[in-house]
């Protein structure tokens, strides 16, 4: 019975730490950049896009495809950085064990 109570206490502590981690991840922001800075995407470590900046020189109706490609690239860059930030924070929670890719909070 004592083992069960100990496990329940550990589960409650882990749940509390996870809530704290969610809050921390919401405060962490990363920036994805493409086109040498022509497109910037700011994203939280919870993968929420916060802002998109597009250089006005890209707003040419004849080159929509270029803008689309740069936007996809900037989003992918931000996503990679956010995933790395989340993994770093999770290592502190899990005592150094890393989570498999894609297994976020």
From Swiss-Prot:
Q: Which UniProt keywords apply?
A: Cytoplasm, DNA-binding
The regions listed as transmembrane in this protein's record are: none
Superkingdom as given in the UniProt entry: Bacteria
Location within or outside the cell: Cytoplasm, Nucleoid
Q: Name one GO molecular function term.
A: DNA binding
Report the InterPro entries cross-referenced here: YbaB-like_sf, YbaB/EbfC
Pfam families in alphabetical order: YbaB_DNA_bd
Family assignment from sequence similarity:
Belongs to the YbaB/EbfC family.
What's this chain's function?
A: Binds to DNA and alters its conformation. May be involved in regulation of gene expression, nucleoid organization and DNA protection.
NCBIfam families documented for this protein: DNA_YbaB_EbfC
Spell out the subunit comment: Homodimer.
* This protein's name: Nucleoid-associated protein RPE_4812
**Protein species of origin:** Rhodopseudomonas palustris (strain BisA53)
């Amino acid at each position: 019975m004592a083992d069960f109570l100990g496990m329940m206490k550990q589960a409650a502590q882990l749940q509390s730490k996870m809530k704290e981690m969610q809050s921390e991840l919401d405060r962490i922001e990363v920036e994805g950049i493409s086109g040498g800075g022509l497109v910037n995407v700011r994203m939280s470590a919870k993968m929420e896009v916060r802002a998109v900046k597009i250089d006005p020189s890209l707003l040419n109706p004849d080159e929509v495809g270029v803008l689309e490609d740069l936007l996809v690239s900037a989003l992918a860059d931000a996503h990679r950085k956010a995933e790395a930030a989340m993994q770093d924070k999770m290592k502190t929670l899990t005592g150094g064990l890393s989570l498999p890719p894609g297994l976020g909070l």
